[in-house]
Amino acid sequence: MPVSGEFADWATELTVRHIPVPVRRATGRRILTAIAGGVGAARVGLVDPAVHVAVGIGGPPEAELIGHAAGRLAAPAAALANGMLIGAARSDPEGVGAAMAVVLPVALAVGQEVKARGDEVLVAVIAGHELACRLAAPDGSRSVGVLGGALAAARLMTLDRDRVRDAVGIAGGFVGEPIGTGGTVGLAGGIAAGNAIIAARLAASGASGPACGLDELCRSWRLRRETVVAGLGAEWACEAHRAATVSDYQFDLETCARLGGSRRDARALVAEVRALAFAPSLDSILALTVKVAAGT
């Protein structure tokens, strides 16, 4: 079976009960780190061009921006801005850190669009991030976030396995290697997040992607298929976290300090993200990012 088929089967059947606690814990920390970075970037206007473009695109009221009271925008536009906000402040030294700056904005945008529960969003983030982690280069040089983002979007849109495979295959057409350094921070991640949602929507509308697209990418990257899919569902490439030795209490305190603004609102935001698996929606989390960014 092609690599994309293996991941499509796995992702469509994945539930929160299948995910070990250490994986959920590590993902929760990455989500907290990403959102805190996005709030900080929003507060200082680090990627205002992305916000202006997203608001200009507008579209149907589907998803909100991190740290901005701009109302609801089309999900691809929101993912573009949120991807740049998270990517601009990324300080995670992990080689796969850039992938979360794509997968999470996609999951937030599509999650709000389809009114997904928190546990559904968490599963989508983990599924997309696991795919990205298995394909990523140690130095982060491969642009794999769009592939994980497409998988997360397709999962939240409840596409069947064939459409999930198509979404990832279409997203493969957006994979490209960096052409240099410099320029506006977070740009690549934001564009990848928007493209991931477009890929999933194309698949949902009947567009097809190359059935063996991931296999071709693996060959071009000199990755063995057996290595990419080995232990899928039993072994987790996304489990390791650089702050694993830090207690949750200390990690949350450090995150509150990074968030700044009202200490009460910062604590509330951390608590909401920690309880993501039990949340009825994402609305309160996005609303709190606006309050924390404004410092009110």
Predicted regions and their residues:
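Hydrophobic alpha-helical hairpins/lids featuring a short glycine-rich hinge
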Residues: 80-135
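A generic short alpha-helical patch detector that favors 3-5-residue windows
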Residues: 2-3, 98, 120, 141
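Short coil/turn segments at secondary-structure junctions
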Residues: 14-15, 112, 183-184
